[in-house]
Amino acid sequence: MTVPKKALSVRAPWWWLILHGGKDIENRDWPTNYRGSVLIHASKWWGTTEVLLTMQEFGPLAERGGAPRVTMEQVRPYGGCIVGMVDIVGCVSASDSPWFFGDYGFQLANPVAFREPVPCKGALGFFTVSPDVMERVRAQVGGNRP
């Protein structure tokens, strides 16, 4: 299996909803032509009120899709880590997905949550992870994804 070299930093709890809650759109104010797998980096940014309100609003949607209930205390420690990977299969400016709002939506498929988070400095937009981070990601991805 090929592990992507590119990563995308996503704020809490959105990254958790992508990997566990059925979130099939990542909203951005810029479009992308990129298609393929990308590592998901959990941003260190933390706005308690925003995270809480997001979890209250979108948590039930994720739970209807079979995701377990999650708390802020469970999500917060993962900030500053690569936590999984997902495929970007399209970019749209309109969608019927309940997860879509904003200017552009990266259409997502095949999320994989990693067993152990891998510490990594994030960046804006797509960014390339360092060789040592890639090595740690490869070491645990083995059986997670065909």
Region roles according to the model:
Residues 1-146:
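Structured alpha/beta reader/binder surfaces that contact nucleic acids or chromatin modification marks
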